[in-house]
């Protein structure tokens, strides 16, 4: 049991993605400040992506009603809009949910990598602004480390699971030094967007051609790449080492004759036909130096990778189940640490005062003798304090609030606030 932790969220699980925008915060920094000022939270972290808006909070007694009202005010919406979209968790459930996030289990695409980086950015922003403190910093740091370890040991995030990422990965596997190659993307639709995202993420330069230059320019403004004239491309495939073709054209854009001409003046080329129906003449594959792959082949590889990821889900859930009690003990121990630190500090201050008196009474005592006495008194204090402090930490890990409260009274420790 971990009192004082709360998570409130609107995600793709309980809201259409297109409707999530109304629950987002235009200024996350201002929202962090607003939640602390308006909902009674001592600490908070906001994880906001295209698929989720989540608030993690810590206080003595989190109040969901206050959080809901503050959220509505900060997002500029009526509280009634939450309806059944807003979901919440408390205590140990918060730990489990955050582990599911960092391990990729709660993502729309199971195992996707982006969420781990987004969680890291969220805690970094909260820490920098002072919105998070000892409890949430510890929670997020441990969840990020555990999520990374779970991903590495289970392979939940391995393999491409979009046509775009798989297509780019195949090119990387088949062509050396892709950064020095010229890449052309024909088309500006959904599949082209996936390809462009994957190319951009890996730092590759690429050109984009569409039916109109304006469409190519708009696509490149949003997704990266350099727009080129469609007509120039059709007459000059020879300028490219890699072609990604993803259009809805009802005819072959890339023909056998055009590629034959290209091969007379250059070496090999890799062509990925991601169109449906196909827009690359299959006879192109018979030409020496040409590597052609079509949408069906790539989609089958994506399906295989997705099946592999799903087969790892059980192992991930098992590891999360084992990690939750470990994290819960670590979080509970936080209640004991300031008491133990204060008790040790007070005991050492008393030791040093009495040591100074004793050394003064002894008079002309040598430096080495003084060090021996200093070491002796320090060892005595640490030995005397060690057992009760370890027992205090153990009681705290087990959630025994009575022992922690009793220790605070015995050592005259006053909690902040």
UniProtKB/Swiss-Prot annotation:
| One Pfam family from the record | GlutR_dimer
Task: Write down the position(s) of the site called Important for activity.
Answer: 97
Keywords, A to Z? NADP, Oxidoreductase, Porphyrin biosynthesis
Q: Which reaction does it catalyse?
A: (S)-4-amino-5-oxopentanoate + tRNA(Glu) + NADP(+) = L-glutamyl-tRNA(Glu) + NADPH + H(+)
Q: Where does substrate bind?
A: 49-52, 107, 112-114, 118
Q: Which InterPro entries does the entry mention?
A: 4pyrrol_synth_GluRdtase, 4pyrrol_synth_GluRdtase_dimer, 4pyrrol_synth_GluRdtase_N, GluRdtase_CS, GluRdtase_dimer_dom_sf, GluRdtase_N_sf, NAD(P)-bd_dom_sf, Shikm_DH/Glu-tRNA_Rdtase
What's the entry's take on its domains?
Answer: Possesses an unusual extended V-shaped dimeric structure with each monomer consisting of three distinct domains arranged along a curved 'spinal' alpha-helix. The N-terminal catalytic domain specifically recognizes the glutamate moiety of the substrate. The second domain is the NADPH-binding domain, and the third C-terminal domain is responsible for dimerization.
Q: What does this protein do?
A: Catalyzes the NADPH-dependent reduction of glutamyl-tRNA(Glu) to glutamate 1-semialdehyde (GSA).
Add the further remark from the entry.
Answer: During catalysis, the active site Cys acts as a nucleophile attacking the alpha-carbonyl group of tRNA-bound glutamate with the formation of a thioester intermediate between enzyme and glutamate, and the concomitant release of tRNA(Glu). The thioester intermediate is finally reduced by direct hydride transfer from NADPH, to form the product GSA.
Q: Which NCBIfam families match?
A: hemA
Put simply, this protein is called Glutamyl-tRNA reductase
**Which species is listed as the source?**
Cenarchaeum symbiosum (strain A)
């Amino acid at each position: 049991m971990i009192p004082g932790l709360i998570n409130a969220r609107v995600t793709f699980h309980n809201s259409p993605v297109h409707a999530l925008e109304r629950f987002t915060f235009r200024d996350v920094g201002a929202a962090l400040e607003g939640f602390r000022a308006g909902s009674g939270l001592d600490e908070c972290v906001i994880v906001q992506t295209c698929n989720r808006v989540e608030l993690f909070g810590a206080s003595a007694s989190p109040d969901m009603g206050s959080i809901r009202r503050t959220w509505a005010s900060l997002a500029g919406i009526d509280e009634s809009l939450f309806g059944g979209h807003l979901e919440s968790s408390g205590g140990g459930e918060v730990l489990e949910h955050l582990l599911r996030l960092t391990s990729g289990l709660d993502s729309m695409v199971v195992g996707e990598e982006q969420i781990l980086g987004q969680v890291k950015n969220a805690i970094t922003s909260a820490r920098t602004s002072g919105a998070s403190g000892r409890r949430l910093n510890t929670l997020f740091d441990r969840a990020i480390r555990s999520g990374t370890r779970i991903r590495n040991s289970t392979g939940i995030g391995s393999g491409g699971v979009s046509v775009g990422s798989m297509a780019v990965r195949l090119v990387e596997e088949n062509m050396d030094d892709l950064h020095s190659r010229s890449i052309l993307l024909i088309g500006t639709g959904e599949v082209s967007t996936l390809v462009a995202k994957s190319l951009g993420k890996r730092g590759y330069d690429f050109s984009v051609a569409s039916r109109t230059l304006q469409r190519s320019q708009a696509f490149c403004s949003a997704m990266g790449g350099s727009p080129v004239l469609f007509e120039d491309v059709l007459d000059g495939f020879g300028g490219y080492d890699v072609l990604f073709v993803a259009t809805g054209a009802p005819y072959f854009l890339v023909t056998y004759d055009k590629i034959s001409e290209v091969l007379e003046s250059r070496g090999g080329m890799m062509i990925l036909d991601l169109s449906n129906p196909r827009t690359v003449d299959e006879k192109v594959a018979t030409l020496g130096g040409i590597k052609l792959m079509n949408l069906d082949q790539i989609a089958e590889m994506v399906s295989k990778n997705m099946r592999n990821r799903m087969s790892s889900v059980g192992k991930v859930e098992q590891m999360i189940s084992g990690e939750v009690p470990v994290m819960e003990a670590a979080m509970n121990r936080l209640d004991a640490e300031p008491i133990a630190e204060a008790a040790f500090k007070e005991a050492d201050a008393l030791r040093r005062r009495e040591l100074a008196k004793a050394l003064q009474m002894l008079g002309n005592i040598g430096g080495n003798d003084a060090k021996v006495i200093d070491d002796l008194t320090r060892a005595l204090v640490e030995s005397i304090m060690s057992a009760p402090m370890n027992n205090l930490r153990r009681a705290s890990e087990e959630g025994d609030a009575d022992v922690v409260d009793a220790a605070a009274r015995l050592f005259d420790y006053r909690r902040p606030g």
